[in-house]
């Protein structure tokens, strides 16, 4: 009998959610995703310190923003030597409300990849699913730069991403689960909110059905998992990005993985497709306390780690 990881691969593209490219080798993901927090965690390991030092040594006089982007691309290049597919590299979260700056940084990241001989088709530029981030992705996509919209917690965000024609979205599962569990307090019963009843799983399922029912080609990559059950409950999703720890857990477990999401699923009603204008987007997002709070929190956390990464690079450069 095959492992659950192998069984999952039959239905879903498996992606590694880490900056630790050495951890990817044994688990053979197709793609990989990174973010500022994952890169910060990786460069604090002794094994990756030479990569940081080389970037600083080769570009010592460069501004911190450029050093950061060069470090991200250095990690991305190493990852692409391991995975056969794509890597997602994130624009600085501090630019989440600045469309123009996000576009400029996204173009800059792609230019660095292409200068290193990496075709743009192997790179996804990650931006936050704010209104500004989504509009930046619209412009980048028009330039032939494929985008991954992250920090996505609600159907209105997904609708706006589809309207912008983005390549891929990353709806979060675990952070939605965290919010509802905290809100429920002592009333939360884990067994009753597992599997298809998990609020994070339900959110991704809602988005998946909306996209497939309306023939939307934007890829859906479930992200931010807290346990193996959440992953198995989304088998059949286009892609799932999974931490090395949970990948290893799936690899060590034997058994079949039934398909939970299918393109021809007719279960349940879905809203009519609509264009996403700014007033509608902000109104709908504001009405969803969970999505509003988790989006803001995610930007704060990624921004804080970007500041720490700046400090680490600045220290290495003697500034």
From Swiss-Prot:
GO function term, MF aspect, one: transaldolase activity
EC code(s) of this entry: 2.2.1.2
Stored HAMAP family: Transaldolase_1
Protein name as annotated: Transaldolase
Naturally occurring in which organism (per UniProt): Bordetella petrii (strain ATCC BAA-461 / DSM 12804 / CCUG 43448)
InterPro entries tied to this protein: Aldolase_TIM, TAL/FSA, Transaldolase_1, Transaldolase_AS
An example Gene Ontology biological process: carbohydrate metabolic process
Compartments (UniProt record): Cytoplasm
């Amino acid at each position: 009998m095959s492992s659950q990881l192998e069984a999952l691969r039959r239905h879903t593209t498996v992606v590694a959610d880490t900056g630790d490219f050495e951890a990817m080798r044994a688990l053979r993901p197709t793609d990989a995703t990174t973010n500022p927090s994952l890169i910060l965690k990786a460069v604090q390991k002794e094994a990756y310190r030479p990569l940081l030092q080389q970037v600083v040594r080769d570009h010592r006089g460069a501004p911190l923003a450029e050093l950061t982007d060069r470090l991200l691309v250095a990690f991305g290049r190493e990852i692409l030597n391991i995975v056969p597919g794509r890597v997602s590299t994130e624009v600085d979260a501090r630019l989440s409300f600045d469309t123009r700056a996000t576009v400029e940084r996204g173009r800059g990241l792609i230019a660095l990849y292409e200068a290193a001989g990496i075709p743009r088709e192997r790179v996804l530029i990650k931006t936050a699913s704010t209104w500004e981030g989504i509009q930046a992705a619209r412009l980048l996509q028009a330039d032939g730069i494929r985008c991954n919209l992250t920090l996505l917690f609600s159907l209105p965000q997904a609708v706006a991403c589809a309207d912008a024609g983005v390549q891929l979205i990353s709806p979060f599962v675990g952070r939605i689960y965290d919010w509802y569990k905290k809100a429920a307090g002592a009333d939360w019963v884990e067994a009753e909110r597992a599997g298809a009843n998990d609020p994070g799983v339900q959110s991704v399922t809602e988005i998946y059905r909306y996209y497939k029912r309306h023939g939307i080609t934007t890829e859906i990559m479930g992200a931010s998992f807290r346990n193996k059950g959440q992953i198995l409950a989304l088998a059949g999703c286009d892609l799932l990005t999974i931490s090395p720890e949970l990948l290893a857990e799936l690899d060590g477990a034997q058994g079949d993985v039934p398909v939970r999401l299918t393109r021809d699923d007719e279960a349940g009603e879905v809203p009519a497709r609509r264009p996403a204008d700014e007033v509608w987007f902000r109104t709908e997002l504001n009405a969803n306390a969970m999505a509003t709070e988790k989006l803001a929190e995610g930007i704060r956390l990624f921004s804080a780690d970007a500041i720490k990464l700046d400090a680490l690079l600045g220290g290495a450069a003697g500034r």
